[in-house]
Amino acid sequence: MIEKGGSEWEDIYVDAFSGDIKSEPRPHDEGFFGVLVHIHEGLLMERAGQVIVGFTGVFAIFIAVSGFLLYRNFWRNLLRLRFSRLTTFASDAHKAIGVFCAPILIAVSVSGAWWDLRFLFTPPPQNLAPQKIDDNLSIDALVKKAQENFPGFNLHYIGLFPHGDAAITLFGYKADQNFLHNEYSSRIVFDGSGNLKQIKDISEADFTERLLSSFRKAHFGNYNEATKFLWFLAGLAPLFLGISGFYLWMKRSNFKRRKA
């Protein structure tokens, strides 16, 4: 949940059967891994950090694409690893790892850059008057109504964001939707009285919405367990590529100086 007027997500535990509150609100991202998340998203610098990380993603896209183009005949020696000299091995490994990981790194960089820089291209949300939610409104009844009006809809999470005509939004997915879309790419909106206001089926959305809906899985590799592991390995690749690339650059610079 987010405190009214705030921007930070917090967690609170509630007994699903009795409705009793079992904990105090606590930051959603806390501890060591929470700090890592904030560093990853914005270097702990709010908007300025987002801009830096976003343009770093743009730079990473350029590096991945240009490297792929420079080594466009990669299929000739893709699996060749020569161990005769360290420089030769570093060059072969740099090219092979770069080619294998380039598609994943491009997908990760494009989605990450968009998330960090989208505030530059999208208008700020309107400050609409909040809408009161009927105290007697049944969430179970809304879920049932949603599934009746949107056959095949599977609920993923419920958003209580009262503003304008929208008060309760059910986020989910269709069982037969494209595997590229995430688990809450479709949504059903109700007003504070439980009246159905909108059904947003991602399969009927325009190209831009469908593209943006595919970013989450493309960024995290959440297609299946095997792809998660592949994305993990690809995430380690920039470390090796940076070290090997710097080493090769140093060797070439020294060679040119000696030749001069």
Identify what each model region corresponds to.
Residues M1-A260:
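Conserved histidines in hydrophobic membrane contexts and catalytic metal-binding motifs
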